[in-house]
């Protein structure tokens, strides 16, 4: 199906997944919202999502509420929330930096909103919910204080830097932008994240 066909009738996406075995698909966050809101039970007649291998969410910030609504909407059609994989990628890194491994539902943790505004991501019983993108598996990733340019300790907020064979060398005919973003052999993403001691990270904000 084409992007236009999906926008015209978002149910087509789930219909295709439900009519084939071993489905694997990826889409941005807004597509999950559209599919959940505009797919009727009648659209899913005879569909079975029990054999879906993975549904990756990327290309824009993954919203915990969207993932929850999507999982609940299609649970009656045997969709397991463990196949939903929040993913973090960059065009500059050939789209892929990290994704949550399959086998468990996406992890959503509340963080103290006041502490987040101070540059500290501290877990709390209530607060701003952030979703885990898993552990980075791009060739090389650092979480760095953008001012000191030193790696931050677990639990602190820093900018994600990456480098490797999958990372481009710069922007075509844009020397100023290239000089700003590609420094010291690393691509500076502009995304601020919090990394757990186990290596899993949560996107907090944008620096640029």
Where are these regions (language model features)?
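ATP-dependent adenylate-forming carboxylate-activation enzymes
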Residues: 1-17
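Conserved ATP-binding/catalytic segment of the ANL
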Residues: 131-155, 159-208
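Gly/Ser/Thr-rich phosphate-binding loop
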Residues: 17, 22-26, 38-128, 140, ...
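Conserved strand-to-helix beginnings and helix N-cap segments that scaffold or border functional pockets
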Residues: 10-11, 64-68, 172-175, 200
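Alpha-helix N-cap/helix-start capping motif
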Residues: 10-11, 29-30, 60, 165
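Small/polar loops that bind or transfer phosphate-bearing groups
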Residues: 1, 27, 58, 163
């Amino acid at each position: 199906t084409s992007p236009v066909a999906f926008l015209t009738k978002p149910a087509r996406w789930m219909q295709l997944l439900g009519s084939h075995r071993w489905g694997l698909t990826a889409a941005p966050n807004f597509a999950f919202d559209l599919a959940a809101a505009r797919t009727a039970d009648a659209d899913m007649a005879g569909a079975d999502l029990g054999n879906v291998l993975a549904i990756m969410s990327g290309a824009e910030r993954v919203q915990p509420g969207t993932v929850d609504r999507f999982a609940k909407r299609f649970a009656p059609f045997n969709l397991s929330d463990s196949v939903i994989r929040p993913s973090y990628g960059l065009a500059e890194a050939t789209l892929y930096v990290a994704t949550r491994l399959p086998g468990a539902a996406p992890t959503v943790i509340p963080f103290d909103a006041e502490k987040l505004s101070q540059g500290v991501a501290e877990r709390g019983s209530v607060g701003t919910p952030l979703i885990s993108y898993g552990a980075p598996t791009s060739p090389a990733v650092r979480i760095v204080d953008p001012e000191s340019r030193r790696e931050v300790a677990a639990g602190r907020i820093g900018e994600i830097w990456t480098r490797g064979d999958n990372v481009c060398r710069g922007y075509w005919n844009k020397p100023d932008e290239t000089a700003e973003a590609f420094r010291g052999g690393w691509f500076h993403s502009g995304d601020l994240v919090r990394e757990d001691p186990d290596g899993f990270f949560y996107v907090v904000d944008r620096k640029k």
